Amino acid sequence: METIHVDLAERSYPISIGAELFCNPAHFSSVIPAKKRVVVISNVTVAPLYAQQIIDTLNTFECQVSLLELDDGEQYKNLDTFNQILTFLLEENHSRDVTIVALGGGVVGDVVGFASACYQRGVDFIQVPTTLLSQVDSSVGGKTAINHPLGKNMVGAFYQPKAVIIDINCLKTLPEREFAAGMAEVIKYGIIIDSDFFDWLDENMEKLYALDHDALVYAISRCCQIKADVVAKDEKESGVRALLNLGHTFGHAIEAEMGYGNWLHGEAVSAGTVMAAVTAQKEGLISQQEVDRICALLKKAKLPLKAPKEMTVEAFMKHMMRDKKVLSGKLRLVLPTSIGSSEVVTGVSERVLADVIEQCKA
């Protein structure tokens, strides 16, 4: 097992990564006092697989546990689900000392985290991510949010969990399409910060898809360590943390325009990463050879390289100008400058963006 610490002074917390963690009371009792009231919030897909394991473990130190099951899908990461959680907590008369366990993928983690931030001005919560994407990205760093019809993650808060518990055995029940979507975020870390990790992924992709224990623990740990280091330097995304959004400006536009859930987040990020790399090449920031290597690794990970053919330049620009990185009306893009480095760039012309969009459509 690996343990990584997110260093945020009094709000620091551990990330535990390994197998069979749900059955080990130590991972929960270290952050949940005995006899505590706990609410496990999951979805209708994940709860039947893993909720009872966690409830049984919590019962070993006499916690009073209740379970809420949400609908499954990006389309439910909305105000209605947020309100459903708050109503459940109120109807059960939970006070500020309740602990909430977010058991599921990125949607569950985001909406449950946001509800935890808001309920009685903030209650403790633990992230228990069950998809590769949530294990390597969304569960770490305290970003919580719900979607708005006009934009993804537009309503939310920075609110850190008390712990992140990552059991790689969950990946055995994850559909391959969802696993591939998570690989988009894994590959992102290699592109923006760590060229050695990029090379390692290129050499070990088959092991990852075979769910090799050591390969998974290493890849997830490396991603979490990179993100923990970045978050410790820039929790509220005023600087270096923005680099973690490689591919997301284009990708969020795809998700919003095509309808949440039709493209998985990682699929949209993959296509968006290609668009960012092509933009960087047109701006003279990266070589065509490195763009080709990025595309080849995404393809090896069974990810889409092209944006939807039905999306117009106007549709892309409409959504991209609502991106949270826009400042003073100017679009800022995270662009790779080589494999292993990246920067935030302002001032890419609409003509270049239009060329990129047309070039990168299916």
UniProtKB/Swiss-Prot annotation:
Pathway: Metabolic intermediate biosynthesis; chorismate biosynthesis; chorismate from D-erythrose 4-phosphate and phosphoenolpyruvate: step 2/7
A GO cellular component entry from the record: cytoplasm
Residue ranges that the Swiss-Prot or TrEMBL entry lists as coiled coil: none
Chain positions recorded as NAD(+) binding sites: 72-77, 106-110, 130-131, 143, 152, 170-173
Example of a GO biological process term: amino acid biosynthetic process
Recorded superkingdom: Bacteria
EC number(s) per entry: 4.2.3.4
One Pfam family hit: DHQS_C
InterPro entries, A to Z: Dehydroquinate_synthase, DHQ_synth_AroB, DHQ_synth_fam, DHQS/DOIS_N, DHQS_C
Any one Gene Ontology molecular-function term assigned to this protein's record: 3-dehydroquinate synthase activity
Localization, UniProt: Cytoplasm
Cofactor: Co(2+); Zn(2+); NAD(+)
Binding residues for Zn(2+): E185, H248, H265
Catalytic activity reported: 7-phospho-2-dehydro-3-deoxy-D-arabino-heptonate = 3-dehydroquinate + phosphate
Textual note on the cofactor: Binds 1 divalent metal cation per subunit. Can use either Co(2+) or Zn(2+).
Keyword annotations from UniProtKB, A to Z: Amino-acid biosynthesis, Aromatic amino acid biosynthesis, Cobalt, Cytoplasm, Lyase, Metal-binding, NAD, Nucleotide-binding, Zinc
Primary role: Catalyzes the conversion of 3-deoxy-D-arabino-heptulosonate 7-phosphate (DAHP) to dehydroquinate (DHQ).
Family: Belongs to the sugar phosphate cyclases superfamily. Dehydroquinate synthase family.
Protein name as it appears in the record: 3-dehydroquinate synthase
Naturally occurring in which organism (per UniProt): Aliivibrio salmonicida (strain LFI1238)
